[in-house]
Amino acid sequence: MQKFIIHKGIACPLEYANIDTDQIIPKQFLLAVSKQGFGRHLFHDLRYLDDKESVLNMDFNLNKKEYQNSSILVSFENFGSGSSREHAPWALVDYGIRAIIAPSFADIFKNNALGNGLLTIELAKDEVLEIVDELKKSQDKNIEISLLEKRVFFKDKIFSFDLDNFHRICLLEGLDNIALTLKHEAQIKAYEKNSKSFLV
């Protein structure tokens, strides 16, 4: 998993509340078990005008020239609602999204996202609206995020956010669940060696 310490990138506003996991990655694309290849299907029903993904919907912000190569999304409340599918953060990460800023996230999506290296940043609704309005007006659409400082830098504004220490350390060190387990491999083996078996 890629480390997240400081990231600067183009931010794209998605002015929708309650974006659910089926909108993020529709169910017909969930057949694969690898984390790669889902990015092309991200927001399928919003990004494309046809099922073959050959005609882009140019009214959708991610398809607009100024938001191409976006690595940060700024959206509205309850992002990631709906069914629990880890493919949703897989699709976002595979597309190149490193962070999402919103007033709130669905709990399961948030945990899945953080576990896959995707930073979820919760800001007050008025702060999110301020960022969205400025993104639409400004030619410079770059936002800088410091996980070390837990701050978002945009124009001359600084927005502070909170994140629990466990997920913060995992992101800073680039540790997913498997890497985190392997980090404690010696202790696990020592425990298994010294623990008594209850099988007879």
UniProtKB/Swiss-Prot annotation:
It is an enzyme of class 4 (lyase). It comes from the Bacteria. It catalyses: (2R,3S)-3-isopropylmalate = (2S)-2-isopropylmalate. One of its GO terms (molecular function) is 3-isopropylmalate dehydratase activity. Keywords: Amino-acid biosynthesis, Branched-chain amino acid biosynthesis, Leucine biosynthesis, Lyase. Pathway: Amino-acid biosynthesis; L-leucine biosynthesis; L-leucine from 3-methyl-2-oxobutanoate: step 2/4. One of its GO terms (cellular component) is 3-isopropylmalate dehydratase complex. GO terms for biological process: L-leucine biosynthetic process. Pfam families: Aconitase_C (PF00694). Its EC number is 4.2.1.33. Signal peptide: none annotated. NCBIfam families: leuD (TIGR00171), PRK01641.1 (NF002458). Catalyzes the isomerization between 2-isopropylmalate and 3-isopropylmalate, via the formation of 2-isopropylmaleate. Heterodimer of LeuC and LeuD. Belongs to the LeuD family. LeuD type 1 subfamily. HAMAP family: LeuD_type1. This is 3-isopropylmalate dehydratase small subunit. It comes from Campylobacter jejuni (strain RM1221). The lineage of its organism: Bacteria, Pseudomonadati, Campylobacterota, Epsilonproteobacteria, Campylobacterales.
